[in-house]
Amino acid sequence: MELTPREKDKLLIFTAALLAERRKARGLKLNYPEAVALISAAVMEGARDGKSVAALMSEGRTVLTRADVMDGIAEMIPDIQVEATFPDGTKLVTVHQPIV
């Protein structure tokens, strides 16, 4: 199976998000890469489902709370930018202050 670099990046994000999801379900607080991966994957899946950029910018802020992440992580992530594939093409989605 041949994958482009972009497809490899998507799979890496998905794998990290899956790990983060499992750790969160076990009650562990997420670290920086886990938090970013989980929010990024949620945005990418929402785009695949056909949601709008505006909806994903808003929904991206509801994926995690400060209680879900280690101390100081929320402050380390002022925004997350995800290049997501929508039914009408690829667009950049920016989630400002993703962890509240």
Swiss-Prot record:
GO biological process: urea catabolic process
One annotated Gene Ontology cellular component of this protein: cytoplasm
Cited InterPro entries: Urease_gamma, Urease_gamma/gamma-beta_su, Urease_gamma_sf, Urease_subunit
Hydrolase keyword on record: yes
Quaternary structure and interacting proteins, as annotated: Heterotrimer of UreA (gamma), UreB (beta) and UreC (alpha) subunits. Three heterotrimers associate to form the active enzyme.
Catalysed reaction, written as an equation: urea + 2 H2O + H(+) = hydrogencarbonate + 2 NH4(+)
The protein's name in its UniProt record: Urease subunit gamma
Name of the gene: ureA
EC assignment: 3.5.1.5
SUPFAM superfamilies the record matches: Urease, gamma-subunit
Keyword terms: Cytoplasm, Hydrolase
Known pathway: Nitrogen metabolism; urea degradation; CO(2) and NH(3) from urea (urease route): step 1/1
Any single Pfam family the record assigns to this protein: Urease_gamma
Family (UniProt): Belongs to the urease gamma subunit family.
Subcellular location: Cytoplasm
Enzyme class per UniProt: hydrolase
Molecular-function annotations in GO: nickel cation binding; urease activity
TM stretches of this protein: none
